[in-house]
Regions:
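A ligand-binding cleft/hinge motif common to bilobed small-molecule-binding domains
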Residues: 66-67, 71-89
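Mature extracytoplasmic/periplasmic domains
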Residues: 100, 109-169
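Short, hydrophobic alpha-helical packing/hinge segments within bilobed ligand-binding/sensory domains
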Residues: 61-64, 80, 118, 131
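Conserved C-terminal helix/tail region of periplasmic/extracytoplasmic solute-binding proteins
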Residues: 63, 165-199
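Solvent-exposed loop/turn segments at secondary-structure junctions
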Residues: 8, 16-19, 78-81, 97-100, ...
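Generic hydrophobic alpha-helical scaffold/packing signal
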Residues: 62, 66, 84, 109, ...
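Extracytoplasmic ligand-binding site segments that recognize negatively charged/polar headgroups
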Residues: 1-69
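Periplasmic-binding protein-like
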Residues: 39-48, 86-112, 156
Length: 199
């Protein structure tokens, strides 16, 4: 990302944990680091990236990348699958330094009024055939092992989305760092965005 050939060619997703995480991972630190010295190092490293950042954007990142309005984007894997469906010249890779692993959760709130309906919906979504269909639609890999047999090999064999342990061993789940530390991440991200405007 810091390659001078990428000047004004990178799109970043508008999310503090993801962007600060890029800085942390590039330095060999955990995405869940709470050491303020490490976080300041990550901020400084991101400031060095400023000349290469074209924009920090939200959901429009998919359209911008598909239209080749930037050479590189830091995106979630499901968005990458959608982007690559729209433009087969684009590719997706997971940084060797590491990245995050995430998953959606289906929960039933304590205040839910239709518990039976909620269970029916969850069971419907977890049905292997339905789960496979959902995976093909959203582009995100499925953790539902029973659904894998309903997916084509071109999906399950794609190591960009179903990587082996050599890649997954460098992935981390984002931990809840608490309000104070989350506030610190958000402050650093805001400082980074302001630094870009001044640069």
């Amino acid at each position: 990302l810091w390659d001078e050939d990428l000047r004004s060619e990178i799109l970043l997703v508008d999310s503090a944990r993801e962007v600060i995480g890029v800085g942390l991972n590039s330095l060999g630190y955990s995405l869940n680091d709470t050491d303020t010295d490490h976080l300041q190092e990550a901020y400084a490293k991101l400031c060095e990236l400023t000349p290469n950042v074209k924009a920090i954007v939200g959901d429009e990142i998919k359209m911008l990348l598909a239209n080749e309005e930037a050479a590189v984007g830091v995106v979630w894997s499901g968005d990458a699958a959608i982007i690559m469906d729209e433009n087969d010249k684009l590719d997706y890779s997971i940084p060797s330094e590491g990245s995050m692993v995430w998953f959606d959760n289906i929960v039933i709130p304590a205040t839910a009024r239709n518990i039976e309906g909620a269970h029916l919906f969850i069971n419907f979504m977890l049905d292997p055939e339905n789960s496979a269909q959902n995976t093909e639609y959203v582009g995100y890999a499925t953790p539902n092992a029973a659904a894998l047999e309903y997916l084509p090999e071109e999906i399950t064999g794609d190591e960009r989305f179903y990587p082996g342990p050599d890649v997954t061993d460098n992935l981390e789940v984002l931990a809840n760092l608490g309000k104070r530390m989350l506030g610190y991440y958000n402050e650093l991200f805001l400082e980074f965005k302001m630094h870009r405007k001044r640069a």
